[in-house]
Structure formats: C-alpha cells, structure tokens
Amino acid sequence: MQRFTRPLFGQVLIALALGIALGIWAPDFAQHLKPLGDGFLKLIKMLIAPIVFSVVVVGICGAGELKKVGRVGGKAVIYFEVVTTIALALGIALAYAFGPGHGMNVDPKTLDASAMSSYMATAKQVESSGVAEFLLKLIPDTFVSGFMKGDILQVLLVSILFGCALSLLGERTKPLVGLIDQLSHVLFRMMAVVIRLAPLGVLGAVAFTVGKYGAGSLKQLGFLVLLFYAAVAVFVVVVLGGILRLAGFSIFKLIRFLRAELLVVLGTASSDAVLPSVMNKLEKMGIKRSVVGLVIPTGYSFNLDAFSIYLTLAAVFIAQATNTPLALSDLLLILGVALITSKGAHGIPGSAIVILAATLSVIPAIPAIGLVLVLSVDWFIGIARALGNLLGNCVATVVIAAWEKDIDRARANAVLDGKLDIIEEGEAAARGHGIQVPSASTLPHA
C-alpha cells in the first residue's frame, strides 16, 4: 500500500475516489470543498506565464539560427490544421453513424433560453471579431499585460520577440540568458512544490461537482456523453497513436508516462492544471526546450483536438434532437466554421458553450437555442475534452521534435520504457544523496 500511495498518481487516484464518495454521501459538505480545487488551479495558473516566458526565451536562444525557430513554428501550424480537420470530420462521422440525438423530438420553442443568455452574449462578441481583430488581440497593450491577464498567446508573442532579440544581440546577452535559464529552474521547482497539492485540488473539485450536480444530469444525455468519450478514445488510440507510431513511439507508453498529469486533469477538468508539469516532463524526456516552449503553449490555443470533435458532434446532435435536416453544404459549413472558431478558444470563460454558440450562429439551419440540451452535461464532457486536448498537444510536441531531429531518442525510449525515472521526487532524492541522474549519452540505445 505504501508503494502505491507514495507516487503522485496514486495520491490523486485516492483523492478522486474520496471526492466521488463525499459528493454522493455528503453532498452539502462536499460543496464546501470547492475552494480546494479553485485554490490549486490559481496556484498553477500563477506560474504558467513566467514558465512559458522563460522556457521560450531560453529555447530560442539555444536553438541557434532563427530560421530553425520559424521552421518549427511552420511545421506546428501545418500539423495543427491537419489533425484538427481530422478531429472535426470524426465528430460529424460519429454523429451520423450513431445518431445520439435521434428520437428526442425536441421542440426548440419549448426550451428555456434564460440559462444561455450570458453564453450567447459572449458568443456574439466572438462571432463579431474577425481575423484582423483576433490578430490584434494577440498584441498586448504593454510588455506585462499578457502576464497580468494570464493570456498565453500574448505571453508567447512577447517571449518570441524577446528571445529573438536576445539571439540577434549574440554573445553579450549570455549572462542575461543564463539568468533567465536559472529563473526557469526556480519556477519549475516552485511548480514541483505546488503540484504536490494536486490531491487536495482534485478532492475539492470532484467533491464539489458530484455534490452539486450528481450523476442524475447524465441520464437524459448519457448516450451523447458516452459517445463523446468513445470518440476521444478512438481519436487518441487510432489517429494520435498512428501518428506517434510513424514517429517511432507508442501512445500507450506516453499515456503511462503522463499518468499523474492525466489523473489531475481527470479530477479538475482543466488541462491548465498540468501545463507547467507537462512542459517540464517533455523536456526531461529528451525533447529540446525550444520545441517544447513553442509547440505546447501554441497548441493550447490552436490544437484543441478533443474540443474540435465536440464542436461538430454537438452541432449535429442538436440538429438531430430538434429534427433539423442538414444538407451536405450545411455539414461543410459546420466543418469550415468550426475550423476557425476552435482557434483561440482557450482562456474564454465557458469556452466550449461559447464557441459552440458562435459556430451555430453562423449556421442558420441549426437552432442555437438547442445549446440548452448540452449545457447540463458540459462539465462531464469537459473532462474528456481536457484529457484529449492534453494528449493531442503532447503527441504534437513529440512528433514535431522527431521531424526536426530535436529529440534524444535514446533518452526518450529509456523514459517511456520505464528504465529512467524522471519524476520530481525521484530526482530530488537522487540529488540529496549526491547521485547524478544519467545523461542521455550514458543510456543504452534501444
């Protein structure tokens, strides 16, 4: 039992079970535990912006030529668009194959629109903002605005510009680059301390959610929820697994490597909670910092694979539930609009419902009021969205690093095979005993 509870993933698993139990048997008390989950997420979000800044800046300075940075970014954008399109198409295909909305026979006029008012207001703002306005929002008002708001895209832009400027100045900036590098190590150590609180955060978040909503809200729309979970599983195993296999790695080994982070996401329904930890682990796995620093933060806004599946699946579900026929032109319009609206969804409050509302508002055939149907199960669906999005970005980072030959395959294989333990507490224990963690050059080639 001691060996099971000591690793972080074991503690999170126990907290998850306790949260469910409290939510079922002591719902009133469980709802008072919400601050535990909120506090944990706030601690994590506090560290995200400075970690992204330090990792990206040091990564760019260590990448050598700026052309290489541009090449990595270009490949990332191409990868994101191709994989996102596959995810959107999968959502439509599964909706038509299984018809989760057929037989509900919902009259849109009978639905209560009051619950959707705040979401629709935000959706109109998203819809009205064109490409030019979206690009302008990437530019912060001041150097620190992105840090203060926690806007990852703005922080990323500042980081890239700062890193490029340091790289162009050459040797004279080495002391500053070294200082920022040391800062990143301090931030990651802070993150390691905060992540130890994950069991408390998961306990609070799960207990509150189960206590407030229970499992009853799943009954009416249970098939849609199950279908979405199955869709994400198929996408991860078949699509992402196939892409990762072409790069020479196994999706199942990657999932095992990230099991602690996935359990935290399972409990909090937020991939933000593990962003710093994932960046740290991928770098320790053998991927160059420049690739991790560019792909992961960008992917959090532009590579939302599971979110993309949800957009098209939910849109067709609402059409089926309200007996709204869709022509081929409507499906192509859904695909095209969702390909645009899915970008930059990260950071918008209630982003899934808001972006779905913005998508449906452009498609007159589907009644937007049908969003009320999926509102009650959005939290449950959000768990699979967060898990799928996280795995999608981790796979993207590994694949792009493999394309660029910016991954130490010997080290990566040793880590994924379990031959090299890189979890934070293992390294801390090794340093405490004066033991050096093996470098990539000392590992046997797989």
Swiss-Prot record:
Sequence intervals crossing the membrane: 7-26, 46-64, 77-99, 152-171, 192-211, 221-243, 291-313, 318-340, 353-375, 381-403
Could you list this entry's UniProt keywords, alphabetically sorted.
Cell inner membrane, Cell membrane, Membrane, Symport, Transmembrane, Transmembrane helix, Transport
Give the molecular function GO annotations.
Answer: fumarate transmembrane transporter activity; malate:proton symporter activity; succinate transmembrane transporter activity
* Localization, UniProt: Cell inner membrane
According to its UniProt entry, the protein's GO biological process terms are:
L-aspartate transmembrane transport
Q: Which Pfam families match?
A: SDF (PF00375)
**Topology of the protein relative to the lipid bilayer:** Multi-pass membrane protein
Q: Does the keyword Membrane apply?
A: yes
Cited InterPro entries = C4_dicarb_transport, Na-dicarboxylate_symporter, Na-dicarboxylate_symporter_CS, Na:dicarbo_symporter_sf
For this record, an example GO cellular component is: plasma membrane
Q: Known PANTHER family for this protein?
A: AEROBIC C4-DICARBOXYLATE TRANSPORT PROTEIN (PTHR42865:SF1), PROTON/GLUTAMATE-ASPARTATE SYMPORTER (PTHR42865)
Q: What does this protein do?
A: Responsible for the transport of dicarboxylates such as succinate, fumarate, and malate from the periplasm across the membrane.
NCBIfam families the record matches:
PRK01663.1, PRK13027.1
Family, per entry: Belongs to the dicarboxylate/amino acid:cation symporter (DAACS) (TC 2.A.23) family.
Q: What is this protein called?
A: C4-dicarboxylate transport protein 2
Q: Which organism is it from?
A: Ralstonia nicotianae (strain ATCC BAA-1114 / GMI1000) (Ralstonia solanacearum)
Underlying gene: dctA2
